[in-house]
């Protein structure tokens, strides 16, 4: 494996469903010599889409990680899913990438899911460039897409290519850095292309865009700016250097175009990945906590530092068993060595180490900073854990995982299925942190929870195919939550005397809504529950305090209104008392649970429901009906905008009202309208609706 860090690119390819992400990745693998035959998504043969459900549905569910080479550089590509139910996969990949290519559909432009993925990439400060795909399709409009990148994403596009010809006459691109045309030969599957003079009818436009490009890049370097302003020629080398600098600092985002399906534009895209996206060295450091001191700091990304790596994905491979994908941030690791999982504080022995190509694998003996490899047979490591050198323990930044918004009951069909189902669900939950399972206390049913109907459908499908479990499925239910709306204080004493050792614990706790908490720490802003101890003078000994937190964490899973998990509140332990003999961690855990049960009703608790951001694209003539229907679903229409000859309606609608919406929309618009939705936030349920929900529980 190439050991020079500057020769590695860890990139993700992310976009909206159907923008042509997997096809683009397929072409990259083909031209870099990793696959001998181009896999077509709509034939169900794409190399990256290797789970059966993916090949059938033509969508990518799990980000396959694969390695290829271009211009002596090692490119590790993570292909991410574009369907909104799988945003967790995207979030995980972005965390371990150094750069990304955002693929846009040249016809549809910036779609809702593209926005979601873009915001996620902003969160992790991932430098990226844009590839406007499908330039050969009817209605493709490169310039409109560039405007949408500006308007919808609030990003600064740097156009470095222009399309030559439109729709079926799309022939190639104008390279604004070299100021030449790149034209592909159709008969060579796009493997052959040549640089030519820019066509006459494009010269004026190319000059105009070249001037814009120079205006934007010279701002990054005073010397080159002086040279440019005094009328001297800026060299190709200098332009490339500045584009790289601006891309890495996110001053702008280079925009390229092509048609991956028609094999045009992929090689210049690869050149741009190598020229402009960062290597691990450009990122320089990774945030983490030093275990010995508890101090948060930036650790250098370097081969000479002690070993550290982040596990970002777990996959079950039919031949190797469980595979844990890791991104190595520092140092190196060889098979046979032992490292420590610092989150679980457990040792892990490194057995087989594999370099993955979609679902083929190559054994390697060592991996070092910058590499992405899969480890076989780790016992205790789950997604988001850190593996580190035993002598210098670090915990790298954890990933935030969203709360599931939809749930269904599953019942195994037979006794044999029942035994297999437990194993299947625990394996699937280990792979996917946005998928949870629980047992309903009252009915004893197994409940599975996820990010959307498609997400759960695929989980059930995998249970059937991979684990041979047959199950009956209930109707989807909304994952409601509860919260409090005002602060309350509770002083509770737990006492139990019954022969032998007694139990004693007193706790005084303030519960308050998170929105009322002043000076929230940065790392607490995305949490749904915060616990803090303000005990002074040992009123509750240090070793008992984790018992209080554990008790609250367990009990908040069943709230006080209708038994839904309680979120968005802070619990502060302010006082308490203990007994030398009768107190224990367990006694404090019980006291905390009872304090919760007694205190929460005083906090004016309310029921919350998931609100989805819905976007409907409909022809003008159905607009009134669509809006009327959204209003009848307790929707709040936020606005409309024309897109081509259709209207885009944006609204916030409770998830509870969106089940079966696809059929209603189809009949309202004679099948011509389409919609997409993403979870946006939790909001209070109106009183009369809340009463109905409580009555059902």
Swiss-Prot record:
The keyword Cytoplasm appears for this protein: yes
Gene3D superfamilies, per the entry: 3.30.230.10, 3.30.70.240, Elongation Factor G (Translational Gtpase), domain 3, P-loop containing nucleotide triphosphate hydrolases, Translation factors
One Pfam family in the UniProt entry: EF-G_D2
Domain of life: Bacteria
Name the record gives this protein: Elongation factor G
Positions that bind GTP: 15-22, 79-83, 133-136
The keyword Nucleotide-binding is annotated on this UniProt entry: yes
Major site of localization recorded for this protein: cytoplasm
Gene: fusA
Localization per Swiss-Prot or TrEMBL: Cytoplasm
Family affiliation: Belongs to the TRAFAC class translation factor GTPase superfamily. Classic translation factor GTPase family. EF-G/EF-2 subfamily.
Entry-linked HAMAP family: EF_G_EF_2_B
Keywords: Cytoplasm, Elongation factor, GTP-binding, Nucleotide-binding, Protein biosynthesis
